[in-house]
Amino acid sequence: MQIEKIVRKGYSSELTNEQLWEIYKSMKTQRLLEDRLLKMYKGGQLSGAVYPGIGQEASMAGIGAGMDDKDIFGGTHRDLGVQLMKGVTLKEVALNFFGKKDGPSKGRD
């Protein structure tokens, strides 16, 4: 049985060390941030809900890494890795979790 490699036109099946490093950093950042947010939530420091994606870091970072500038992302929960890979800053993430008007959702999330 021969296995054929299927590669979408214009895409590579290979990742550079730099791309792999960016994906790893996104995964690690997701885990650290969500661990901290959960502690804050359980301690009553966050008024909204937290929907962590613990255990799903690779999926989200991989999706984000595979997207280009033309792709539209409309995430809801457990999508922190996609946000980070698409360039959302940790400051923007924090502003959103704390419901600040300067955040991406203007405090309405």
Go through the PLM ranges and name each one.
Residues 1-59, 65:
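Conserved acidic/glycine
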Residues 35-38, 45-109:
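Cofactor-binding active-site loop characterized by glycine-rich and histidine/acidic residues
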